[in-house]
């Protein structure tokens, strides 16, 4: 039986799953992910992104509700630098 050559396409589509042996060495198990695994992975990533967005917006809301003098100064300086970059073109 002839073994399939690893083409760049196959290498890029293979899922690398690293498992640790009892001896502490790492082995790589190559497998083609099925559509269920891909969808599961996609949903997990999107959930993490959504949680990150919620955290960022929550921190921004807290900042606006109770800003410190230093944070206000930083915010004003950032806006000023951004305004200077844009210039009078708007």
UniProtKB/Swiss-Prot annotation:
InterPro entries the UniProt entry points to: Flu_proapoptotic_PB1-F2
Main location: host cell
Coiled-coil region: none
This protein's record includes keyword Protein transport: no
Pfam families registered for this protein in UniProt: PB1-F2
Highest taxon in the source lineage: Viruses
Comp. bias intervals (Basic and acidic residues): 17-31
GO cellular component labels: host cell cytosol; host cell mitochondrial inner membrane; host cell nucleus; membrane
Residues flagged as site, Low pathogenicity: 66
Entry's Gene Ontology BP terms: symbiont-mediated perturbation of host apoptosis; symbiont-mediated suppression of host cytoplasmic pattern recognition receptor signaling pathway via inhibition of MAVS activity
Subunit structure: Oligomer. Interacts with human SLC25A6/ANT3 and VDAC1. Interacts with host MAVS.
Protein role: Plays an important role in promoting lung pathology in both primary viral infection and secondary bacterial infection. Promotes alteration of mitochondrial morphology, dissipation of mitochondrial membrane potential, and cell death. Alternatively, inhibits the production of interferon in the infected cell at the level of host mitochondrial antiviral signaling MAVS. Its level of expression differs greatly depending on which cell type is infected, in a manner that is independent of the levels of expression of other viral proteins. Monocytic cells are more affected than epithelial cells.
Family: Belongs to the influenza viruses PB1-F2 family.
Protein name from the UniProt record: Protein PB1-F2
